[in-house]
Amino acid sequence: MKKNLTELVSILDRSGSMGGLEQDTIGGFNAMLTRQKEQEGEANVTTILFDHEVQLLHDRFPLHAVAPLTEKDYYVRGCTALLDAIGYGVEKMVNIQRHLPESERAEKVIFVITTDGLENASKRFSYEKIRRMIEREKEQYGWEFLFLGANMDAVKEAARFGISSDRAVRFENDAQGVAVNYHVVSETVSRMREAPCCASIGAEWKEQIEADFQKRHHR
């Protein structure tokens, strides 16, 4: 195991319903990268964009070498192949970690999955298959999965593919909500990278996102 090395996998929704939030998403993602670059320790960045198709944007780029996201990279279209994006990312990282020498395997693997809508376009992966894949990596290797969903019961949806309630949160899909999202995600990823064990980070990580959502909905 290579100490202080993190594999950070971001799975970003760019389906048509994200229209109008392109700049907010780009700005939030770039701010997160900047924050991570300031932190000690190594990290490889994998970024997967999805609509009705899945696109690999960054393929384990060293963190310091990742250029800012631009409008040429992130533009919206199509439907929501959420399961295919998650399945592709997990399958890819499993293959990488299994085939690397033990001394080169990342100490931590963190997935951040962000979507504003429910699955409606996947062809390769089912909920059950994703659940088995995620549960295996969590239980055997301590991988972390954060799920941030808008326009849905995010906790209920995350449970369908094996992500526990303390790692799932519903956010408000507008400029303010997206900004809060990325601020919290950046802070949480930093804490996970620094912590001796990611599991030591409890459900408190998502309190700011929950408070923002509840404030706007008076609940």
Language-model features: locations:
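Acidic, low-complexity intrinsically disordered regions
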Residues: 1-219
